[in-house]
């Protein structure tokens, strides 16, 4: 059976990078959620918190919008 988790139990591999780049921009999780909503992504602060903690999956569409708002490439968010 295939399990969709990293070896350390996280549900995504981009949460730590999202947190890092958000912090570098000096914006809160709520502000990031607001900016994502302006860009058409229906997401709230709690979802951002869960993504950064590795507790929530991130779709490819979400990743693209998050990268755009953080002014990064999706590759940078995936740390590849």
Question: PLM features: residue spans?
Answer:
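Phosphate-coordinating loops and pocket residues in cytosolic domains that bind phosphorylated ligands
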Residues: 79-80
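Short, contiguous strand/loop micro-motifs
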Residues: 5-6, 49-51
